[in-house]
């Protein structure tokens, strides 16, 4: 078997890593060894945060719904329970949007929840 020299593949791999590290500060964008570590770490953060993003948005929506429902005299948990009893199925993302941009509609939803809880 002939000897395989890896210069071409090594150069391609180095170029790929340095391209991914473009825009990083200092040696992280210029030196292969440091850039490789930075790109790997960035990938780990990206993987982790794609999952955390979902949790964080749900927390934000719940906080907004809680604030708006308390302004209308009902806690978050009782509001959600009331909506379930009234068989109103609106997800938290849309509820948070309504709470921020359409307070009148949100107030009517709170009233419906209160009526369902009273029954």
From Swiss-Prot:
Q: Name one GO biological process term.
A: ribosomal large subunit assembly
**CDD domains under this entry?**
Ribosomal_L20
Q: Which GO terms describe its cellular component?
A: ribonucleoprotein complex; ribosome
Keyword list, A-Z = Ribonucleoprotein, Ribosomal protein, RNA-binding, rRNA-binding
What InterPro entries does UniProt report for this protein, alphabetically? Ribosomal_bL20, RIBOSOMAL_L20_CS, Ribosomal_protein_bL20_C
Q: Which GO-annotated molecular functions does the record name?
A: rRNA binding; structural constituent of ribosome
- Report the Pfam families cross-referenced here: Ribosomal_L20 (PF00453)
Protein's UniProt keywords contain rRNA-binding: yes
HAMAP family tied to this protein: Ribosomal_bL20
Describe the family membership recorded for this protein in Swiss-Prot or TrEMBL: Belongs to the bacterial ribosomal protein bL20 family.
Annotated NCBIfam families: rplT_bact
Function, please?
A: Binds directly to 23S ribosomal RNA and is necessary for the in vitro assembly process of the 50S ribosomal subunit. It is not involved in the protein synthesizing functions of that subunit.
Q: Which PANTHER family match?
A: 39S RIBOSOMAL PROTEIN L20
Question: What's the protein here called?
Answer: Large ribosomal subunit protein bL20
Gene symbol here is rplT
């Amino acid at each position: 078997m002939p000897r395989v020299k890896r210069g071409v593949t090594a150069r391609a791999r180095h170029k790929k890593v340095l391209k991914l590290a473009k825009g990083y500060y200092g040696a992280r964008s210029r030196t292969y060894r440091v850039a490789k570590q930075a790109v790997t770490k960035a990938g780990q953060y990206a993987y982790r945060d794609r999952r955390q993003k979902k949790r964080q948005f749900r927390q934000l929506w719940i906080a907004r719904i809680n604030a708006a429902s308390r302004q209308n005299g009902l806690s978050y948990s009782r509001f959600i329970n009331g909506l379930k009893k009234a068989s109103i199925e609106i997800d938290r993302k849309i509820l948070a949007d309504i709470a921020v941009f359409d307070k009148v509609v949100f107030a009517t939803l709170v009233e419906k929840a209160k009526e369902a809880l009273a029954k």
